[in-house]
Amino acid sequence: PRRLYYAYDKDVYANQDVDDEFLKSLAEGGFQVGEFAKLCYGIGADNNVKTLEPADAVRQTKELLSLENVNIAEAAFLVGNMFVRADIIEKKGDVINLIEVKAKSWNPLEDTFVSKNGKSTNKAIRPYLYDVAFQKYVLVQALKEMFPEKNFKVNAFLMLADKSKTATVNGLNQLFKIKSAPQKRSVVEVSPDAGDIVSS
């Protein structure tokens, strides 16, 4: 949440890591995973809130949420000074699923959310749980303001890469090519074949 706040006031909070190649490569992997998740949820350009302007992003999100059933990428929610962008929102009637997509790999056969002593959360996953919990909190409060007459049931999920599984498609990552953009932020070019492969 803090990074997102700073990102919108670049004149005051300059990003010192903008030219760090290692951080850039990590971010690019995250972009690829994000695009893959959009395909998994059938999200096209019309349901992808791309604007970086917070007020406009919130307005677009509200318009999309007025539909009975919809999947949205990069939905925006603002309450007071708390602002979040949700990777994926899946709305089915009055049920809203918040899906936070992470490039982190995870083995459900070996890894757990609970530490070995069973008394706290696993340190490796804790920041992701805090992130999705904060997003859910803001989402629930924002929905009360956006749609005061509605009573939504909100669920929150983490979407992680399952490293216990083998990909059924060779070169899956090649369907999501990283391209440099003029503003120094990389973009992902999704192969036209990617949708067919993901849906099969």
Residues covered by each model-derived region:
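Mg2+/Mn2+-dependent nuclease catalytic core
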Residues: 66-200
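Metal-dependent nuclease catalytic cores that hydrolyze phosphodiester bonds in DNA/RNA
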Residues: 1-96, 168
